[in-house]
A protein has these predicted regions:
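N-terminal subdomain of nucleotide-sugar transferases
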Residues: 1-43, 71
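Nucleotide-sugar donor phosphate/pyrophosphate-binding loop at the beta->alpha transition
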Residues: 98-100, 109-128, 138, 164
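Short N-terminal targeting/anchoring amphipathic segment
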Residues: 64-85, 94-100
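Active-site proximal beta-strand in glycosyltransferases
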Residues: 3, 75, 92-110, 137
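Conserved donor-binding/catalytic core segment of Leloir-type glycosyltransferases
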Residues: 176-207
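Nucleotide-sugar donor-binding and catalytic loop/hinge architecture
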Residues: 1, 169-181
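Donor nucleotide-sugar binding/catalytic pocket of nucleotide-sugar-dependent glycosyltransferases
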Residues: 123-170
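Nucleotide-activated donor-binding/catalytic signature segment of Leloir-type glycosyltransferases, i.e.
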Residues: 215-229
Length: 229
């Protein structure tokens, strides 16, 4: 099968969306499918003012249709609600092409944190964005319930797997850190509200595993915590 994936989030960004679709593409390719990505690196981009790490495509509108018609995919999936995702969504809707979408980030809450835009307003936009999708793929039952409560239907649970070759139980390693250890594993970025955790006066050691745009700043500010990358 020929599968087209459109995503506004891509390398060199470090986040769950990029990792998810990299892994998915590699797995599909290993099974004999042909996977093509429409991502920001194929276009002229500008940095998002409130989050410079995120690059937004600006010259993609007239190229999207050419890419789709040339590739002739059997399936089209829109991973994000950004400029590229919007362009692919609109092209598919206009030309009666079936497509699926994903809801990977709590976008309304994220935008509210970064730019103070009301959550209710963003949910209305998301409802419009996903209304023509054949299926809206989400990671958990709680997110399904949340989206359904805002009128976003045709939600399907798509859980994330774990590469058991890369991640598997090993013998305990003595980190020589004061006990107890409070562990965070994930992206190091503003929307994770990690400062609420790092400010806590706790006996023991705060240990953070992961990377992201806020790592250097937080590592410098909270010297009592251990950042292992």
């Amino acid at each position: 099968l020929k599968i087209l994936i459109a995503s506004d989030a891509w390398l060199p960004q470090i986040n769950g969306v990029v990792r998810t679709y990299q892994t998915l593409g590699n797995k599909l390719t290993s099974q004999g499918h042909e996977v093509r990505y429409i991502t920001p690196d194929k276009f002229i981009t500008i940095p998002l003012i409130i989050y410079p790490e995120i690059k937004l495509a600006i010259n993609h509108w007239f190229k999207i249709g050419v890419i789709i018609e040339k590739f002739k995919p059997d399936f089209i999936h829109v991973a994000t609600e950004g400029p590229i995702g919007l362009a692919v969504r609109n092209y598919c809707s206009k030309n009666n092409y079936a497509f699926t979408t994903s809801y990977c980030t709590k976008f309304p809450e994220y935008i509210n944190t970064m730019a103070k835009i009301p959550v209710s307003f963003t949910y209305k936009i998301l409802k419009w964005f996903h209304k023509n999708s054949s299926a809206v793929m989400v990671s958990s039952n709680s997110i399904i319930d949340e989206l359904n409560s805002h009128g976003i239907k045709r939600t399907v649970k798509w859980s994330r797997g774990v590469d058991i070759k890369a991640f598997n139980p090993k013998n305990k390693i003595d980190l020589n850190l004061e006990k107890p250890i409070y562990l965070y594993v994930g992206r190091i970025s503003k929307e994770k509200s990690l400062e609420d955790f790092l400010k806590l006066n706790l006996k023991g050691t705060k240990l953070l595993v992961g990377d992201g745009p806020s790592k250097k700043k937080l590592e410098k500010k909270y010297t009592d915590a251990v950042f292992v990358g």
